[in-house]
Each structure stands twice: as C-alpha cells, then as structure tokens.
From Swiss-Prot:
It holds the Pfam family HHH_5. Residues 64-142 are annotated as: Domain II. Homotetramer. Forms an RuvA(8)-RuvB(12)-Holliday junction (HJ) complex. HJ DNA is sandwiched between 2 RuvA tetramers; dsDNA enters through RuvA and exits via RuvB. An RuvB hexamer assembles on each DNA strand where it exits the tetramer. Each RuvB hexamer is contacted by two RuvA subunits (via domain III) on 2 adjacent RuvB subunits; this complex drives branch migration. In the full resolvosome a probable DNA-RuvA(4)-RuvB(12)-RuvC(2) complex forms which resolves the HJ. Residues 148-197 are annotated as: Domain III. Belongs to the RuvA family. One of its GO terms (biological process) is DNA recombination. This is Holliday junction branch migration complex subunit RuvA. It comes from the Bacteria. The lineage of its organism: Bacteria, Bacillati, Bacillota, Bacilli, Lactobacillales. Has three domains with a flexible linker between the domains II and III and assumes an 'L' shape. Domain III is highly mobile and contacts RuvB. It comes from Streptococcus pneumoniae serotype 4 (strain ATCC BAA-334 / TIGR4). GO terms for cellular component: cytoplasm; Holliday junction helicase complex; Holliday junction resolvase complex. The keyword DNA-binding applies. Residues 1-63 are annotated as: Domain I. InterPro entries: DNA_helicase_Holl-junc_RuvA_I, Hlx-hairpin-Hlx_DNA-bd_motif, NA-bd_OB-fold, RuvA, RuvA_2-like, RuvA_C, RuvA_C_sf.
C-alpha cells in the first residue's frame, strides 16, 4: 500500500494524470485532472490509494489526505465504486456533501452520477456521523472568471463525460458557458456545482 507518490506531472487527460517518479510513469485517476494543469512538468506530491481488481491494478490520486479519507469513506458504501466516489469529490462541495448525509437529504445525494435513491439511502445509513471534512485541507471552491479559450471548455466537457455525466446534461452546461472563457478546472468546478444543486 502506498501513502503518496512524489514526482513530476508529465501528462493530463480527461480521466487521469501521469506522475513520473524515478523514471516510471504512474497513471493516477483523479477527481479533476485539470486541477493539476498548473503543475505540468513540476514536482507534486499526490496521495494515493491502490485498488487491485482481477483485471487491473489502479491508482487513485488525491490532493490531500482529507480528500483521500473522504474517498475511502465513499467507496466503503455498498453501490459506490471508485469512479462514482471521484465524481462526488470532483463536485468540490464537501461541506455540502457532509451536510446532506447528516440531514438525510436524499435529493441532493441523487444528483451525483450513478447515485440512485437506494445508494443515497445507503450513504446516509453508512456514513451518518462518520464523515468529517476539515475544509482547509480540501481544494477550495473557485468561481468562474472569464479568462481562457474555448479549448478549455471542450476539455472540461470531456472530463465530465469521463466522470459519468450524460451528454444531454452536459449540452445544457456547455451552452450556459458559451461565450465565456476560463480554465478547464474552473469550468469543471462550476459545472459540477450546477449539476449537483
């Protein structure tokens, strides 16, 4: 088991980043790959969790230990796998997530991709009173500002598809952002907030 990997971020895709450590490139599946776009070709420390399946060995990466703990809590719930957990974390509303669990707000929880009513109820049952978010260690929410190219919007939509959101949902989001400019990371954060609320 690994606690973290330290190395150079060499590649960012819609689903993962590549972290090169001692000449080996590790594929790390992360909640929002474009959050790392400012760190390409720079050293980074990424907290990791390894999932071993019959057909694959996968590494999931996190910006902080608290984000990793939240991920581990989410995948402990029956019906939530690593991809769904990453999609929930990508919404970047961890305080809202904890509040929804504590107040049994099933409607809020079912807005995440692949989370139906039964899974949301299971989340409340399994995690109520157990999930604590230390806000300072988790990525901060960032408002959309007009400042980048439409290529960034395309990358953001690709990443959202990779998280499991439907193309029909994303068409509405894309239309909303047309004519604006921002980073892929900020588009993703804003889109996730819109889809979850």
């Amino acid at each position: 088991m690994y606690a973290y990997l330290k190395g150079i971020i060499t590649k960012i895709t819609a689903k993962y980043i590549v972290l090169e450590t001692n000449g080996i490139g590790y594929i790390l599946h992360v909640a929002n790959p474009y959050a790392y776009s400012g760190q390409v070709n720079q050293e980074a420390q990424i907290y990791v969790h390894q999932v071993v399946r019959e057909d694959a060995h996968l590494l999931y990466g996190f910006r902080s230990e608290d984000e990793k703990k939240l991920f581990l809590s989410l995948i402990s719930v029956s019906g939530i796998g690593p991809v769904s957990a990453l999609a929930i974390i990508a919404a970047d509303d961890n305080a809202g997530l904890v509040q929804a669990i504590e107040t049994k707000n099933i409607t809020y929880l079912t807005k995440f991709p692949k989370i139906g009513k039964k899974t949301a109820q299971q989340m409340v049952l399994d995690l109520e009173g157990k999930v604590v978010v230390a806000g300072d260690d988790l990525p901060a929410k960032v408002a959309v500002q007009a400042s980048a190219e439409n290529q960034e919007l395309e990358e953001a939509m690709e990443a959202m598809l990779a998280l499991g959101y439907k193309a029909t949902e994303l068409k509405k989001i894309k239309k909303f952002f047309e004519g604006t400019t921002d980073t892929a990371e900020n588009y993703i954060k804003s889109a996730l907030k819109m889809l979850v609320k």
